């Protein structure tokens, strides 16, 4: 056991050599009683072997400590429900960005209702600020591992009602929030009695990142996925189809498509074209089969199928906040 511990510490030191300082320090400006914490997680193998490294346990060869910021309600002693916020490809800096206020405003409202909040930084510990120009720099499997390991961390905190933990995010964070309901991942990574009670993904990439072609949902999870009907960054139709597979396999899932809404619709600016984001809608669809192998749909070829630019924004945060809060209060309180 001592030898294993020494090896783990050595690997953590080696993997932290390129770590960046988390931008979430700035969250203390908005949440005075919050604190930065470190969570032991892991980095998966690179594409296309990300899930296979989880399935066979080899992910354990790459431990890493990721950053998180947690805040509890000022009133009461708990245990409290908690909502976890997962960021998009723009990284954890979006949590304090002046043009992306929705998450922290929603978090403040949740705290007032008696629900704790946690913000998760998937990128800084892995030496990246963002991934929107090159999504391959950090795998989606690594980031969903972070979410499950954060759930495991919360299970050891007496201030947390571990049966009432939710998760939310948009784009990459939406993918994490949707995949957080996957039984195969939970069972491989943490105790089988842990689960996210509620998940609210927005505009996840359902076509190109290796989502399970035959999802196995955790029965205790309730998911509300919200999509932009005008989103050309992550197409709504692909997530509607995936949502139908979840429901057919027993998931408690509702999918809502908002007509005319674009990618990142909760950003507090009107939708505008941004040209430095890669889109993969014309690329072959990539999915993970029951054996853990990536399979493809379509005949187009990389890298010619990759396009650049899409409209992002929409200033819909004010409209969306009320049903967002209702979803979590109904399912966590």
How does the language model describe each region?
Residues 4-13:
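Sec-dependent N-terminal signal peptides
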Residues 20-78:
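N-terminal cap/lid segment of alpha/beta-hydrolase-fold proteins
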Residues 55, 139-219:
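Primarily recognizes the serine-hydrolase "nucleophile elbow" in alpha/beta-hydrolase
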Residues 78-89:
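Short beta-strand element of the alpha/beta-hydrolase
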Residues 86, 120-122, 202, 258:
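Alpha/beta-hydrolase
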Residues 89-144, 182-188, 267, 300-304:
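Cap/lid segment of the alpha/beta-hydrolase catalytic domain
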Residues 191-260:
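The feature captures the conserved acid-bearing segment of alpha/beta-hydrolase catalytic domains
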Residues 252-333:
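C-terminal catalytic histidine-bearing segment of alpha/beta-hydrolase fold enzymes
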